[in-house]
Amino acid sequence: LKVLSGFDPLEAIEKLNYHEIEVGCLRTEAVSKAASQVASDRQVRDALVEYQRNFSRRCGGAVLDGRDIGTVICPNAEVKFYITASEEIRAARRFQELSIKDKDLTIESLISELRARDLADRERKVSPLLKAEDAVLLDTTELSIDASVALAVNTISKAIRLST
């Protein structure tokens, strides 16, 4: 993943090419921490909003994942989910994802980081973490990945049937 440091935020966003983004790179702890920091910078955030909105309008639609997608980026999306799980489950899932690369990682440190990020994201002035009023709450604490996806697909299918 290219880092466009030193650029004006608008110029850096214009140079981004989503075709070059490696999805696996987006799921790292470093990107997770950086995303929260970047999201609190008004100038960077404003530049990213338009980029994300344009991405969402691609032919065929798009599925976007983020803490302000339903409230700021795509407030008029046909279907929105507010996906959550208990802190313990979120940390365990993250641990499973990251422990292969980081042998010093602990569940306790991940819970602490999750709490800190959630608090920072809820309290930030720019695009705070909120559940959109019309978002479907999807608590995945007791659900497998397959069950979570099936529930989301079922909800989307119902919404499509109702809109046609």
Question: What are the functions of these language-model segments?
Answer:
Residues 1-61, 88, 100, 111-122, ...:
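ATP-dependent small-molecule kinase phosphotransfer cores
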Residues 75-96, 104-115:
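Conserved phosphate-donor/acceptor-positioning beta-strand/loop module used by diverse small-molecule
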Residues 26, 50-51, 95-101, 120, ...:
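NTP-dependent small-molecule kinase module
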